Amino acid sequence: MIAVTGSTVGKDGTARLLKDDTVCSMSKSDFLIVLGGCGVTEARADFGARVKEYRDLPCSVLFIDGSTDDYDLLAEHPFFPWNGGQIRSISRGITYLARGQVFSLGGSSFLVMGGAPTPDRDDLGKYYTWWPEQDISPEDEKEAELNLLDNGWRADYVLTSDRPRGWGGPGGSEVLERLAFQTDYGTWYFAGPEDRELPDYRAVQVCDRVISLG
């Protein structure tokens, strides 16, 4: 099984997962994908304690980065090839999915693009409440374009932390807007402050729900 969910930051980030029927039915051969805001790499958290919490889940955890990650901590883990894309192995059963990659999982293709801005940030909070690396870069966009080209500009699923700018609401990413225009995708899942469907865009905003993709 492959499932997606929203942010799991905070010391109680895994508590709702342990109460979820979908998660409880999973095994270590199944993947739960956190769409940005994974508590394992949350800034100023107890890394060892967080790793234990996530390894105690019944499933394996994949995640993309968002606006709350410690990017210095992420950078300590080297890249490895896996299922068609690049990953960072954080611990056994906990894996970071790099930006702009197209992965093959369970017979489906997944374009992933982490990264999300922090609103109203200033230099005083730099490397404390926000990191420059959290913004999607031109290099990230180019990586996605090259990998999509290799896959015929097609992905069964797109997984992002932010959303395309033209989809309504404050903020949003111009890079993701361009990728949405260029990519022939099935369903787009992205993190947000509430769970809601965006049928006009074949998209789902995910907060607390755990959604099985089969």
What are the language-model segments listed below?
Residues 39, 43-51, 149-184:
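Active-site-proximal segments of metal-dependent phosphoesterases and phosphodiesterases across multiple
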Residues 1-3, 101-112, 157, 199-203, ...:
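Beta-strand-turn-beta hairpins that frame and shape the catalytic cleft
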Residues 2-4, 31-35, 112, 157-159, ...:
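Structural motif
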Residues 85, 92, 106-168:
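Active-site-proximal loop/helix segment associated with metal-binding centers of metalloenzymes
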Residues 5, 10-104, 181, 206-209:
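Core catalytic region of metal-dependent phosphoesterases/phosphodiesterases
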